[in-house]
Amino acid sequence: MAEYPLKQRFVLDTSLFLSEEIRDDDETFEEGIERLLDTIAAARLDLNISCYMPPSIAAELEHILRERGVSEDVLGKLDTWVIKKHPDRYEVYIPAEVVYRFIDEMSDRVNRGLRVSEKAVRKAEESKQLSNGGSKLSDVDKVISDLREDYRGALRQGVLDSREDFDLLILARELNAGVVTEDTGIISWAADFGLRNLRGRAFPTLLEEYLVALDSPRPWTRGDDGVDPDRL
């Protein structure tokens, strides 16, 4: 254990592990995940840095990793070094202003979703008018596909759209922990919750820099005369 443990805590999102940015060019998906978990383990043992996940997010991540063929050994490391903890939903308080903003944003997004739907209806009607009496199923399918994509963008991107996202923020607030994610919606709301946040792509480098600094000479170990006491 480090002589001066940092005692930092981080709550990790699924997007951290799925980001291509955490992997080296010559690494496979599994190798990148394993290297990240080994770094998390070293930070836990040497720096007392703890990483957490709500069980809901952990289950989601494990399912994705299994689908991508990640070995049980690597999944075992995930279970060992990332602590699963349920957020205390009854004791963690959220400022009323945050709730008001969420309501306003959802109301705005519903209106945007309606506009997207209206646009799709008009587009479908135009396709019908252009029809020469033949089958226009492919045109309708295209309209529906575009509608789904646009509707998802209007309502879901940049917003908390699942219980898992909310669990992550509540747990981070409870633990006074930093949030590690690539999800822009979570990043935005982490700021409103008064939480530290870090892009997932930067997290491995952060831990590695901490570990390197642990073995480097420390200015605060020198005596009043500027001489390193270990060299006397």
Curated annotation (Swiss-Prot):
Source species taxonomy? Archaea, Methanobacteriati, Methanobacteriota, Stenosarchaea group, Halobacteria
List the keywords (alphabetical): Endonuclease, Hydrolase, Nuclease, tRNA processing
Keyword flag Nuclease: yes
Consequence of gene disruption? Deletion mutant shows no growth phenotype under standard conditions, temperature stress or salt stress.
The biological process GO terms on file are: tRNA 5'-leader removal
Q: Write down the species.
A: Haloferax volcanii (strain ATCC 29605 / DSM 3757 / JCM 8879 / NBRC 14742 / NCIMB 2012 / VKM B-1768 / DS2)
Q: Give the function comment from the record.
A: RNA-free RNase P that catalyzes the removal of the 5'-leader sequence from pre-tRNA to produce the mature 5'-terminus.
The Swiss-Prot or TrEMBL record describes its family as follows: Belongs to the HARP family.
Matching entries from InterPro entries are given as: RNA_free_RNase_P
Q: What else is known?
A: The ease to obtain knockout of this gene and the lack of growth phenotypes upon gene deletion suggests that archaeal HARPs do not make a major contribution to global tRNA 5'-end maturation in archaea, but may well exert a specialised, yet unknown function in (t)RNA metabolism.
Where on the tree of life does the source sit, at the highest rank? Archaea
Q: What name does UniProt use for this protein?
A: RNA-free ribonuclease P
Might you give the EC number(s) for this enzyme?
A: 3.1.26.5
Quickly give the catalysed reaction: Endonucleolytic cleavage of RNA, removing 5'-extranucleotides from tRNA precursor
Task: Spell out the molecular function terms from Gene Ontology.
Answer: ribonuclease P activity
Enzyme superclass (EC): hydrolase
